[in-house]
Amino acid sequence: MNVSKVDRKLAIGSSVVFALTLTACGGGSGGGVNSTPPAAPPPVVVTPPPPPPPPPPATSFATAEFNRSDGPGFHGAITAYQAGASGRGVTVGVIDSGIDPTSHEFAGRIHAQSGDVTGAGRVLGDDDGHGTEVTRVIAAAKDDRDVHGIAYNATILALRADQAGSCTTAAPGEDEASCSFFDSAIAAGVNRAVDNGARVINISLGGAGAANTALRSAINRATAAGIIIVVSAGNEGNDVAPKFDPNNPSPFAQALAASGNGLVIIATSVDDNGLISNFSNKAGILQGSTLSALGQSICCQYQNDTIYRFDQNGQTFVRVFNGTSFSAPQIAGAVALLAQAFPSLTGAQIVNLLLTSARDAGDPGTDAIYGRGILDIARAFAPSGTTTLSGTTTVVALGGNGGTTSGPMGDVAMSNQPLNAVILDSYGRAYDIDLAHGLNATAPRLKLTPALVNQGRSVSMAQGTTEIAFSIGAGDSSNAQLAPLNLSSGEQSKARILAGRVSAAISRDTRFSLGIRQAAAGQVAALQGMPTGAFLTATDARMDNGFERAPGQSFALRHTLGIVGITGSVEAGEARLFERSGAEFVRNMQSRYPYALVGVGLDRNIGPAKFALGVSWLREDETVLGARFANFIGQNGARSVFVDGRGDLALVGLWSLGASWRQGWTYANPGASLTGQGVLQSNAFSLDLSRNSLFAHNDRVALRIAQPLRVTRGGLALNLPVAYDYATGATSFGKRQLSLAPKGQEIASEVAWTVPMPGGYFSSNLFWRQEPGHFDNAPDDLGVAFRLQFDF
């Protein structure tokens, strides 16, 4: 049989669109059969387009040439270009009427084995222009002159398959010439493409007859070798007397698909609104193998190797093309881009990618009109399926977050520091990804409101050397009953311990303190006789682990050995972290992760001065100084060492001076990408000045300037995949560090005044937090609080 090219040619001007010529697919088992062009539709008046925008920067792919090119923008090719793909090094076979070898659009990129495959021995050329026009859609050069193709750097294997003379001499009984293509020549072109390393073969031809044995065998051989075939669906959609069913691809396309081992893609045409072109055949029974692409109003006819423009009635026109002939090369160009960008992809994988990434059109899912949908190069280039760090089995969830930092890390999540690594998707494609991009900062700690809100009742008592203090509030009835507090029966059923402490002397030199929901640091300070102050926002450095936590149980024991006190303490509880967003965040939802703390300290009084020095060890099971990172970074917890000191000096006139310092070293445990070799250095400090009986008897005025715990240097040491070799499948790893030191530095200044009153006390606090939460340039937090409390 012979087949014919599938295209239509139009002229388009600034305000008028009209049909100029039309050539439809024809053919059969005998000679070439060409349809008679229908009458041209009447002119359609459209609004003149606005003037073009100013030229974009040279680094932009959206150039004036790009805007003239029909396909790259519509199909999202810029994503591929930004990834460095242009088709370079990929051979695209084009079986058609030949190519203009002198055109600047293909200079230096026409394969040496291009030529006549009919046996006629003709030189490389193109009597009709159809092959050149199709090839421009695939691979016209990006040179800022006219238009450029989808894969503008691809190598072109131009295979001239038109029957000699058919494009220039009209067949008997016909008014004009129409190119004819015999199966034997098409088969020869397919075989030559296979032999010369083509990754994809474009066949913008069609006909009413099925392929012969030689062609079916050639298609089978090519696709068995992993070469993709893209063939036009046909242009019988609006013919009055179609040669074959317009609701299905042409019999020629169906025959190729039947022999194609799943690697034949059939191309239907859509317009630039994504609607099926009225001339296009539909996907029909081969909807699972059909992809729609732009094939309507494709720019432009050339003359003298440039866009042909002509004037008519005072207006300038260009000629554009319609046809599934121009849908197919859009897809072939996309194949070339994928093949260059991801050389390890097989033909089957590329076909599957293009079909499954198509943007839906028509009825939801695959349908009988658009097939799998409209070609979407951007989506085809996006990672697909499960993504993992290259060279590992560690899953990296795209669109997920890299974790949530803690208070001591402040604004580090907003620092935009890159943490690049290579991931592989389910197709084995390598991508460079910034693992730090999804890092979230925890909400700054709320200090004033929790300090003021009292939801329970404070109770304390002392008997000899034993002291008991706790607060109670509403809770569930599963907690222990508290009848000894003389609560009503209703209160007993609802009461739970919010926090409590029992302190007692074991001997003259030894005293212990047992706490429930109380930090061990506070019990240590009480046993040592160190003042803590009545501050709401400025924290004593020794009390500050930096992150939000909920102590569970704690215990401290102090023994006096001569002039020195030795104190040991333990604490277990939960680090709390705001990891959620939206409504869950509004509901104050927090994640909880266990920690344990062990400490030992020394204290001594020297005249009017008191000194304390301590060392503590913090173990976190899943967090790092209160932060929790994604699984691909590591979630094996951390261990920290803190050294802290406190000094208080009683001055003359009831004045006193105090200072605290804490220095920390945190080591993230190895796991996933963490090497365990990084160290975070952190510190906190506070300076106190106070005066008793300043304004009233036994009142106390105190000033504190403090910095909450803050990471000062260091971060996470990571071993990350940094390069991937497609040729060998080998991954190269490199050492990287994610700094966790914030730019901001919170300094909290607070004045507290406490006045005892009969049956209670009155207090007021004035505070000023600069860069609260260690967030650089965050608005200052200013406030004042008043409290009046009575015991009943």
Stretches found by the model and what they are:
Residues 21-24:
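C-terminal motif of bacterial Sec signal peptides marking the signal peptidase cleavage site
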Residues 26-38, 86-87, 161-261, 305, ...:
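Substrate-binding/access-modulating region of protease and related hydrolase catalytic domains
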Residues 49-58, 78-92, 97-113, 120-182, ...:
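Subtilisin-like serine protease catalytic core
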Residues 64-72, 76, 191, 200-202, ...:
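C-terminal subdomain of the subtilisin-like protease fold in secreted/lumenal serine endopeptidases
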Residues 96, 253-336, 340:
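Extracellular S/T/G-rich loop segment that most often corresponds to the catalytic His/Ser-adjacent loop
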Residues 426-428, 433-463, 497-510, 559-563, ...:
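Outer-membrane beta-barrel proteins
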Residues 442-648:
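Outer membrane beta-barrel translocator domains of Type V secretion systems
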Residues 531-544, 567, 581-592, 599, ...:
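Outer membrane beta-barrel transmembrane domains
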